[in-house]
From Swiss-Prot:
Function: Cleaved by the protease thrombin to yield monomers which, together with fibrinogen alpha (FGA) and fibrinogen gamma (FGG), polymerize to form an insoluble fibrin matrix. Fibrin has a major function in hemostasis as one of the primary components of blood clots. In addition, functions during the early stages of wound repair to stabilize the lesion and guide cell migration during re-epithelialization. Was originally thought to be essential for platelet aggregation, based on in vitro studies using anticoagulated blood.
Annotated glycosylation sites: N384
Chief place of localization: secreted
The protein's name in its UniProt record: Fibrinogen beta chain
GO CC aspect terms: blood microparticle; cell cortex; collagen-containing extracellular matrix; endoplasmic reticulum; external side of plasma membrane; fibrinogen complex; platelet alpha granule; synapse
Gene name linked to the record: Fgb
Disulphide connectivity of cysteines: C221-C306, C231-C260, C414-C427
One Pfam family matching this protein: Fibrinogen_C
Top-level taxon of origin: Eukaryota
Matches recorded under InterPro entries: FIB_ANG-like, Fibrinogen-like_C, Fibrinogen_a/b/g_C_1, Fibrinogen_a/b/g_C_dom, Fibrinogen_a/b/g_coil_dom, Fibrinogen_CS
Site, Cleavage: residue positions: R34, G35
UniProt-listed CDD domains: FReD
Domain Fibrinogen C-terminal residues, every copy: 222-478
One record GO biological process: positive regulation of vasoconstriction
Amino acid sequence: MRHLWLLLLLCVFSVQTQAADDDYDEPTDSLDARGHRPVDRRKEEPPSLRPAPPPISGGGYRARPAKATANQKKVERRPPDAGGCLHADTDMGVLCPTGCTLQQTLLNQERPIKSSIAELNNNIQSVSDTSSVTFQYLTLLKDMWKKKQAQVKENENVINEYSSILEDQRLYIDETVNDNIPLNLRVLRSILEDLRSKIQKLESDISAQMEYCRTPCTVSCNIPVVSGKECEEIIRKGGETSEMYLIQPDTSIKPYRVYCDMKTENGGWTVIQNRQDGSVDFGRKWDPYKKGFGNIATNEDAKKYCGLPGEYWLGNDKISQLTRMGPTELLIEMEDWKGDKVKAHYGGFTVQNEASKYQVSVNKYKGTAGNALMDGASQLVGENRTMTIHNGMFFSTYDRDNDGWVTTDPRKQCSKEDGGGWWYNRCHAANPNGRYYWGGLYSWDMSKHGTDDGVVWMNWKGSWYSMRRMSMKIRPFFPQQ
């Protein structure tokens, strides 16, 4: 049964194939070179007839005379003097022309005259028709001429109007060139002289300011008498106002200025880093990060004390000393450009000395910002996330490469690409010392090296959002009541 079905299918396929082959038409002869050319409606315009001129009118040949038929009798033509009446005496011959003779002569001449008159009437009618057409054409030409005359007159009026306007403009330009431009030149010359003097004054002021800024900036404000080893000791001694104080962690070193936060979470915080307005450049070398830079505090509404923190980095030597005095906790606070705030608190925070490249260690995280220092960027997974962990890293600046990016290319360095000094791995999940971007959001084409070099905390806002404010504060760890 299966073999029968296969044989049937083969027969059907053969018949269909033969039928398909029969459907092909025989090839047609090639187009005759002198034949028509079909119009391609997709590419060509359809052919159109040209308008024909009117036929020529007027007189021509006269009508042809009718030919005599064979059975018609041939009329004997006789001279006029042979057509008169006969005399009674045949010998006398033909009489002189009489009424009968004149009548016959007139009858003989009437037919050709009527034919000529009819032909003349036709010619007159043709001339009349032609004259009528000519008159109409002349009338049309006359109307067109009148319209052209009116148009020419209108154009002359427009030309006269524009000529008047152009003349007024020419007079105005002449007056402006002759009167106003010299005056304006004198005014501009005076303005340029004034600008030149202002520029010279600004250059002098800039030179003086640059000379003034060669040394660290100082703040003119009163410093409280109360002091201590750090801000926690100061608050225990009665210093309850958040402002700039003098601390002396060790009697072997001179006291130095710090800003103490006496309000946040029971106070006693020593501010070691603060970003708030981009007024200080954090893209610095190793030595400035070692010693510290920026403005510790500023006056608040012309008060005598410095109640507002400035933008600064306290200095790695000072931070290392403060954290190695005993157990230290770290509080990192940040604020976006909408005013929302989060924080990251680490119960343990230590920075080693310069010989150990200021190695950092943190633990005991809690907070709302995300554990960027210990866990790395939460958006990444696996090895990529591990590369962004900061805990255990050495401190790096663009002139001292200690990051975790192992490469022989000196251009590939985290501190160079990310805008500041920090405990970079390869490279960061947090970048508090990065470039300050107003407005928060920024993109790779806005950055210097096409990298996320802003004031970043990836676990909260990602790589391409720079914080409005970020501060780092430390305090000796002690049990809270």
